[in-house]
């Protein structure tokens, strides 16, 4: 199997004017209602599991079409109504001025006492975060498009040219460090791409191993280190590199329920962020390892570790790794024989295998044999 | 107070040959003892609090001169003796070949069953990590100099040219992302420095704020984001920028016991790593904020948060933030009126103040007023 860049399916879509237009349209609607003496309201797509489903065709976790109507003249709704308008005004200012704020800054910036009362606009960040999520759902835009940045984590190494504002640089010419992925990647462009695919790697130590072994150059791969669960910025970057630049996505994590969960989130999206799956998830992603079959295949029995938690057939179980494993066995997107086999083997053996355990063969092994062989022979999980 | 680059006090010192020489000298000593029919041994500086002290003059946490002798022909020592030799051989190979390994890889790579026995060389990483620390102490080198890399975290933004192997780039031309600090910075060089000082920032969100506000350019500052507790790589980078490049170091954290602990570790080193203070710590570092006095000075009373845990005068206390606060009150390096005042105010008021709370004034406030004013007026804590 030779990995090659394919045709793009999406276009660069960052457009602050579009976001401003949506905000203004919504605000004008409210204004008209006020002028007409009506009770103004927002229609907010309902959150929670009851309004989430797995779209088999698109292979994405998606948001349903249930709406909750939030009125101004309703004692139960008025506070949230006010908070929504405050944050809409704030986002408009951010986007107009080309500035970004973190969720925490957005909270602090908008916390004040309402004149003539002892009431605060927001008591806690747990009040402002959900309103920003509501705005994402109502407007159908990512909070990054509203210039509210997410936590940043993860870095990139490989032969592509990244353009961020006026700066342009090659992400394989930054020494061993690599480029730190910012909280928002909406505006990033890729004027030059000299790689055939993206290898997403769970741990920094493994990404560094591959960089040191010159894997990116030899295999024409772009390495993205997630450093644990992939941040929103990294997930959006993966999505864009696949859909806008046509790069195949291969994911490489530890062989354990947490690693597989990281893969699942990159591929299918998460239930919490179901309304964002179409922009954050990459259902075409494939999984190279680690798998339970790798343990036998590569003779790694003596460097496995025990799963944490209580197995389902023991008192108090399942907990820990076992609990997550059982959940994964039931994921709609893991209902195929390859994944069922790996998950059931993990349950049966009660072990996990780390990426770095491959160092037991030799430091080079992962870069010169394990990955190239598995990818060449197409030994990838769906 | 105008911050300016001063004279270097240390030189670029990375020299793999020096490390190899030390390893070989030690190995030859053992070999000679074996040849002479003697019982071979290592002298290992004793770990633990009993062998750690605060050097008032150097203002550093340092390791004392107590030694433990580890014999081969001693049932209680033989296993560790073997492990030490295994890891010495491994480090020699790494350094000779110019390769790096993580602590975890070093463990996996050296775990095997001793032929003819059921005994493993290492059962767990908790056996190999302390041996690597022993080697650091015995040889007086950082584990990074032995090519064992630490966890990587943190990024850098500002007008300096970084040279890593054949790559050279300006850390202010990488868009908003910045340069991801690698696990090992020993070999990094700085051919060009166009900044007057280093501003070390605890949170990524605040570092990103300052970058967006063009603080690095306007104030000729290099931003280093630690993203929580500073990684070893970041601490070594700060040390080198100060001692080899003469840059003043200013630290900016949340105004809470954890933020002050981050500062303390950058400045004085930590008890666990006392033997490394001379290479990792930077006693000349100064602290700009957040302080308890900032709360009144800038009218931030309504955006403080309560300290976590139980106060010392309540049943079960002190725990959480309060416990750390009490410890900090007793640190030798916080025995000055400025720090005692801040720590006691925190204890009295029971509150903390975050960096991002400054967004309550305006997004620009921190970059255009708070930091420039405090630094210009020299309102820095020792």
From Swiss-Prot, chains A, B:
| Catalytic activity, as annotated | ATP-dependent breakage, passage and rejoining of double-stranded DNA
What is the official name of this protein in its record?
A: Type 2 DNA topoisomerase 6 subunit A
Q: GO BP, one example?
A: DNA topological change
| Residue numbers binding Mg(2+) | 202, 254
Matches recorded under InterPro entries: Spo11/TopoVI_A (IPR002815), Spo11/TopoVI_A_N (IPR013049), Spo11/TopoVI_A_sf (IPR036078), Topo_VI_alpha (IPR049333), TopoVI_A (IPR004085), TOPRIM_Topo6A/Spo11 (IPR034136), WH-like_DNA-bd_sf (IPR036388)
Q: Does the keyword DNA-binding apply?
A: yes
Superkingdom of this protein's organism: Archaea
Family label: Belongs to the TOP6A family.
Tell me which GO cellular component terms the UniProt record holds.
chromosome
| Family annotation (Pfam families) | TOP6A-Spo11_Toprim, Topo_VI_alpha, TP6A_N
Q: Which organism is it from?
A: Pyrococcus furiosus (strain ATCC 43587 / DSM 3638 / JCM 8422 / Vc1)
Which Enzyme Commission number(s) are on file for it?
A: 5.6.2.2
Q: Which cofactor does it need?
A: Mg(2+)
Q: What does this protein do?
A: Relaxes both positive and negative superturns and exhibits a strong decatenase activity.
Positions of transmembrane segments = none
Q: Which residues does the Swiss-Prot or TrEMBL record annotate as the active site?
A: 108 (o-(5'-phospho-dna)-tyrosine intermediate)
Q: Which UniProt keywords apply?
A: ATP-binding, DNA-binding, Isomerase, Magnesium, Metal-binding, Nucleotide-binding, Topoisomerase
The molecular function terms of the Gene Ontology recorded here are: ATP binding; DNA binding; DNA topoisomerase type II (double strand cut, ATP-hydrolyzing) activity; magnesium ion binding
Give every Topo IIA-type catalytic domain span: 14-155
Q: Self-association or partners: how does it assemble?
A: Homodimer. Heterotetramer of two Top6A and two Top6B chains.
């Amino acid at each position: 199997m030779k990995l090659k860049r394919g045709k793009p399916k999406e276009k660069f879509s960052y457009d602050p004017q579009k976001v401003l237009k949506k905000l203004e349209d919504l605000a004008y609607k409210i204004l008209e209602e006020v002028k007409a003496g009506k009770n103004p309201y927002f229609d907010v797509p309902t959150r929670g599991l009851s309004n989430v489903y797995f779209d088999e065709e698109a292979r994405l976790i998606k948001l349903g079409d249930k709406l909750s109507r939030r009125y101004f003249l309703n004692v139960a709704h008025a506070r949230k109504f006010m908070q929504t308008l405050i944050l809409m005004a704030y986002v408009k200012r951010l986007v107009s001025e080309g500035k970004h704020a973190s969720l925490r800054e957005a909270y602090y910036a908008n916390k004040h006492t309402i004149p003539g009362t002892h009431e605060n606009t927001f008591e806690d960040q747990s009040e402002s975060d959900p309103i920003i999520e509501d705005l994402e759902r109502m407007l159908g835009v990512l909070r990054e498009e509203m210039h509210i940045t997410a936590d940043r984590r993860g870095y990139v190494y490989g032969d592509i040219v990244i353009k961020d504002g006026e700066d342009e640089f090659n992400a394989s010419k930054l020494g061993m460090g690599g480029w730190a992925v910012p909280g928002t990647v909406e505006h990033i462009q890729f004027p030059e791409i000299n790689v055939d695919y993206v290898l997403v790697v769970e741990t920094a130590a493994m990404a560094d191993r591959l960089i040191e072994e010159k894997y990116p150059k030899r295999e024409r791969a772009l390495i993205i280190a997630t450093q644990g669960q992939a941040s929103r910025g990294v997930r959006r970057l993966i999505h864009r590199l696949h859909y806008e630049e046509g790069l195949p996505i291969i994911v490489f994590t530890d062989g354990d329920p947490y690693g597989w969960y990281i893969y699942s989130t990159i591929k299918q999206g998460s239930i919490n962020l179901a309304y964002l799956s179409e922009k954050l998830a990459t259902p075409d992603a494939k999984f190279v390892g680690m798998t339970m079959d790798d343990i036998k295949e590569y003779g790694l029995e003596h460097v496995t570790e025990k799963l944490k938690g209580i197995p389902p057939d023991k008192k108090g179980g399942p907990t820990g790794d076992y609990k997550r494993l059982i959940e994964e066995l039931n994921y709609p997107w893991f209902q195929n024989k390859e994944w069922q086999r790996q998950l059931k083997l993990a349950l049966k053996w009660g072990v996990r295998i780390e990426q770095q355990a491959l160092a037991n063969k030799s430091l080079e092994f992962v870069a010169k044999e394990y990955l190239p062989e598995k990818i060449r022979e197409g030994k990838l999980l769906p």
